[in-house]
Structure formats: structure tokens, C-alpha cells
């Protein structure tokens, strides 16, 4: 049995208190608690506490400490239930305490995976223009359940996906102007897959792209790569030269007819 002899406010935090006790051998420092625990257990000078009660106080203090760590972590941005659990594990908090903290956070509505998933989907689609596949994968990695993700993705209709994909194409295609039309389409296709768009949405968007690509741009790309390979292979003669030129330009996505026209032009120049 111990008797509380003194309670003093900590110098660095007015919300924490040092508790001094006497176990029969004079006053000594016992433990420190948050003000929430002080009030919860009615700690005051002269109160007698046994070992069981002391154990309960110290356990609840650990819960409160972990709770405040979680609140601080949440102050920067919303988090999922799993993110909170992972954060506390890294802080070496025990599983029993983690369960209590998460339960309290859920009760206090500091964490809500349904709300998180909806807001995350809106942000990633509107700001970062990610496709639904990537958004789903990221939410799964954050521990959000499949059913909740399916509900949140209803906030991201196909029309919006197409709008975003077309925006990404328009932004990126400028860097592929020196590629053949086919190669440009392949690179844009790869980019949209990485961004998380479905095959259906990608095909719709690339079909629109086909109507925008003019012959002049295609010819510019052909001449750019053709002249580059011409300088590389002009040391070869006859069949070897033409074969290497055809293989190189074909790999770049140009048709046989386009390649033949370019080679004929080079013959006439020579």
C-alpha cells in the first residue's frame, strides 16, 4: 500500500503531473500521469493506492500516451485504421493498448475508413489524375476493405476517367512528337496503364488521339529518325544498308510504305 504525498505540475507540460508516494519509508517519486488519468482515477494527496490500483493507473497512462501519439499523427492528415496501428507498432506499443486506442479513435470519429476512402479517391482523381486501378491498390495497401473501396470508386465515373486520361495524353504527347504515331501510342498506352486506367478507357482515349495526329507530324518523326539512322548506317552498301534502315525504322513504329518512301527520297538525293 502506498499513500500519495504530493502532486506537482511538470515544468515542461502543464497537462502532466508528477506523483510522489510514501510506501512507509518516506516520500519518493512514484510516477507521472496525464491530467486525464489524474482525473479519471481521482488522484489526490492522501489517497491510498494498492498494487492492483497502481497497475491500472500505469496501464491507463500508457493507453493515454499512445492515444495522444495517435492524435498527433492524425493532426497532419487523415489516416486509416491500419495506418494508425502500424504507426503505434513502430512506437513499440503493445497490441492490447493499440486495440484500446483504435477503439477510442473510432468512437471519437477521428478515424473512419469509409470517409477516408471517399476523400482519398476524390483527391487522387481530381488533383493527381490517377486511374481507379492505382487508387484501389493504394487503398488496399492502407488496409481499406474491398467493399469500402468499391463504394468510394463510385465517386469516380467513367466520364471523369476519360477526361483525366485525355488530359494526361495531351500533356505527355508533346514529348513524343519525334516518335512514330504507333510508337507514340504505345508509350501513351504504357503511361495510362501505369496511372491505373482500364483497357476500355485507354482505347477510347487513344482512338480520339488518332484523329488528331496529322501527316505532317508523322513525316517529321520519320525524317528525324530516318536521318539519324542514315548517318549511322551510311557506311554500309546496298542491301545491308537498306536492311538495317528498314529494321531500325520498323522498330520505331513506321510502316513499310513510309520507310520505302523515305529510302526512295534518300536514293534520289544521292
Swiss-Prot record:
Among InterPro entries, the record links this protein to: RecX_HTH_1st, RecX_HTH_2nd, RecX_HTH_3rd, Regulatory_RecX, WH-like_DNA-bd_sf
Q: Name one GO cellular component term.
A: cytoplasm
Please tell me whether the keyword Thylakoid is annotated for this protein: no
Q: Where in the cell is it found?
A: Cytoplasm
Which keywords does UniProt give here?
Cytoplasm
Q: In its UniProt record, which GO terms are filed under biological process?
A: regulation of DNA repair
State one Pfam family annotation.
RecX_HTH3
- Name the HAMAP family for this protein: RecX (MF_01114)
* The name this protein goes by in its record: Regulatory protein RecX
Native organism is Bacillus cereus (strain G9842)
**Which gene does this sequence derive from?**
recX
Amino acid at each position: 500500500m502506498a499513500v500519495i504525498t504530493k502532486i506537482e505540475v511538470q515544468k515542461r507540460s502543464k497537462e502532466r503531473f508528477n506523483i510522489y508516494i510514501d510506501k512507509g519509508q518516506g516520500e519518493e517519486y512514484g510516477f507521472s500521469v496525464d491530467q486525464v488519468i489524474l482525473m479519471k482515477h481521482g488522484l489526490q494527496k492522501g489517497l491510498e493506492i494498492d498494487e492492483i490500483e497502481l497497475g491500472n493507473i500505469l496501464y491507463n497512462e500508457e493507453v493515454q500516451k499512445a492515444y495522444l501519439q495517435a492524435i498527433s499523427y492524425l493532426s497532419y492528415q487523415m489516416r486509416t485504421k491500419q495506418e494508425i496501428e502500424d504507426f503505434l507498432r513502430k512506437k513499440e506499443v503493445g497490441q492490447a493498448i493499440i486495440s484500446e486506442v483504435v477503439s477510442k479513435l473510432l468512437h471519437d470519429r477521428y478515424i473512419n475508413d469509409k470517409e477516408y476512402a471517399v476523400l482519398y479517391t476524390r483527391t487522387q482523381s481530381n488533383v493527381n489524375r490517377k486511374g481507379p486501378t492505382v487508387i484501389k491498390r493504394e487503398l488496399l495497401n492502407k488496409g481499406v476493405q474491398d467493399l469500402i473501396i468499391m463504394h468510394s470508386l463510385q465517386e469516380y465515373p467513367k466520364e471523369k476517367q476519360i477526361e483525366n486520361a485525355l488530359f494526361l495524353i495531351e500533356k505527355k504527347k508533346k514529348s513524343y512528337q519525334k516518335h512514330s504515331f504507333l510508337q507514340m501510342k504505345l508509350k501513351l498506352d504504357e503511361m495510362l496503364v501505369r496511372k491505373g486506367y482500364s483497357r476500355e478507357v485507354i482505347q477510347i482515349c487513344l482512338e480520339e488521339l488518332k484523329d488528331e495526329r496529322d501527316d505532317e507530324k508523322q513525316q517529321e518523326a520519320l525524317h528525324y529518325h530516318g536521318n539519324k539512322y542514315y548517318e549511322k548506317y551510311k557506311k554500309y552498301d546496298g542491301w545491308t544498308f537498306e536492311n538495317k534502315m528498314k529494321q531500325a525504322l520498323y522498330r520505331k513504329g513506321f510502316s513499310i510504305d513510309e520507310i520505302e518512301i523515305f529510302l526512295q527520297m534518300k536514293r534520289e538525293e544521292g
